């Protein structure tokens, strides 16, 4: 088995999908989880206005709405959480995403004060954060807020991770990568667009350039610039297509270097790290 085949298998990626079937699969997956643990009353998700959180949010709200109708349990809710650092650059996109999703409840938690307070506490301890590390601090603060909300609403935190993100490890460890349940896992980036199109999402929300927008020195840095490959490259790779060797090498390099992000904490029984 080639490394490409190993990766495709590990991430459950498929070369072709039926958008309607995958929408139903994700919605039913979320519903089944909540029905299995009836003490759970909410799905909690951070909404940025980008493709992944918009899609995940719509799936969450659909699942909750259907489950309420099926069970008569009005306590079930989907909570969309806005988590700006100060003023969000693409504020209108976030508003448009909220309008499309129509969440049961929208909360806004501005993380700037908490991030700056943490940075100052570290500075006083003699640790000066780089801009890159501060970016990860933002991602972790966002997740911290979501878990606090989930804890107070008997909920689970929903993630937006998908195959095109997982293969490169393009998420913050214990930040946006630290979630309870990931309904998009298996899909690549272009497949996510197919689902949003099928759901009637405004095109500008999934045709915009994806960005984590965590760095102050490089605001709205496109994911593709940070990764050194395009999402089309990554999607082609995950669909089993043959890529230029230099492109495949970059993708596989990201996969190997970030394997620890896709695992629970490393123990003496693990040996995957020996190949990195």
Curated annotation (Swiss-Prot):
Keywords: ATP-binding, Ligase, Magnesium, Metal-binding, NAD, Nucleotide-binding
Coiled-coil residue spans: none
Annotated SUPFAM superfamilies: Adenine nucleotide alpha hydrolases-like
Domain of life from the UniProt record: Bacteria
CDD domains for the chain: NAD_synthase
Gene Ontology process terms (BP): NAD biosynthetic process
A Pfam family it matches: NAD_synthase
UniProt keyword Ribonucleoprotein present: no
Keyword Cell wall biogenesis/degradation: no
InterPro entries cross-referenced by the UniProt entry: NAD/GMP_synthase, NAD_synthase, NH(3)-dep_NAD(+)_synth, Rossmann-like_a/b/a_fold
Residues engaged in binding Mg(2+): 52, 165
Binding site for ATP: 46-53, 160, 189, 211
Oligomer status and interactors: Homodimer.
Biological role stated in the UniProt entry: Catalyzes the ATP-dependent amidation of deamido-NAD to form NAD. Uses ammonia as a nitrogen source.
UniProt name for this protein: NH(3)-dependent NAD(+) synthetase
């Amino acid at each position: 088995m080639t490394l490409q085949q190993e990766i495709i298998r590990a991430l459950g990626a498929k070369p072709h999908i039926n958008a309607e079937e995958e929408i139903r699969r994700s919605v039913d997956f979320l519903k089944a989880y909540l029905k299995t643990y009836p003490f759970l009353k909410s799905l909690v998700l951070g909404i940025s206005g980008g493709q992944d959180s918009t899609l995940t949010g719509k799936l969450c709200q659909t699942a909750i709405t259907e489950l309420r109708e099926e069970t008569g349990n009005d306590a079930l809710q989907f909570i969309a959480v806005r988590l700006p650092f100060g003023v969000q650059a693409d504020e209108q996109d976030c508003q448009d995403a909220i309008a499309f999703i129509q969440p049961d409840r929208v909360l806004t938690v501005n993380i700037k004060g908490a991030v700056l307070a943490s940075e100052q506490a570290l500075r006083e301890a003699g640790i000066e954060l780089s801009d890159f590390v501060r970016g990860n601090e933002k991602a972790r603060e966002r997740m911290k807020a979501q878990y606090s909300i989930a804890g107070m609403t008997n909920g689970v935190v929903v993630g937006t991770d998908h195959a095109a993100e997982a293969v490169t490890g393009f998420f913050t460890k214990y930040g946006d990568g630290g979630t309870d349940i990931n309904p998009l896992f298996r899909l690549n980036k272009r497949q996510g667009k197919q689902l949003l199109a099928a759901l009637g999402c405004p095109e500008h929300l999934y045709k915009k350039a994806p960005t984590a927008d965590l760095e102050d020195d490089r605001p709205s840095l496109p994911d593709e610039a940070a990764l050194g490959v395009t999402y089309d490259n990554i999607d082609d790779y995950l669909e089993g297509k043959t890529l230029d060797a230099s492109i495949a090498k970059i993708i596989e390099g990201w996969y190997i270097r970030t394997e620890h992000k896709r695992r629970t904490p490393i123990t003496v029984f693990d040996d995957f790290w020996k190949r990195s």
